[in-house]
């Protein structure tokens, strides 16, 4: 959000915040508008809960298809699933260029943007992308601003478009991935002494490693 607001301050345009979740998630959009987003899109339906990331991407595309955007900026990962894939999936479904782990952006002209990407071991890469583009922003790219009292008061005058499964023709959507079980592995410790000759110890230890340790 902060990167989008900075781009708007330099180059103009409109910032539209978008989120998918339960009714409580609508507060996130109110906070975004209080900080400077011009309007918001809220996608919410019980049928959208527990969907896989590809299906979620398709839902976003259905909600955004009528938007005339130049940039889609997404975070590093969501708090619930943490897939780190939505930005890439949106770029594929919308036939847009994409960059991940973005640490800095620079609008070059109406048709191109330059992105500084974080690589491993302290390395960075500058890459030029055509617009429109989907860019996944790395954590720590900037310091998010606080909402001002004026910004909070202006939220009531800003528009939020809300979509459910019927609005998006997604009443029959089903997960492509089913989560059968989610659990914390049981940790246990055991000490065992193996006696015998060298050959016997090797044979017993080999049997333990092959058949008992998982």
Predicted regions and their residues:
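N-terminal glycine-rich FAD/FM-binding segment characteristic of electron-transfer flavoproteins
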Residues: 1-214
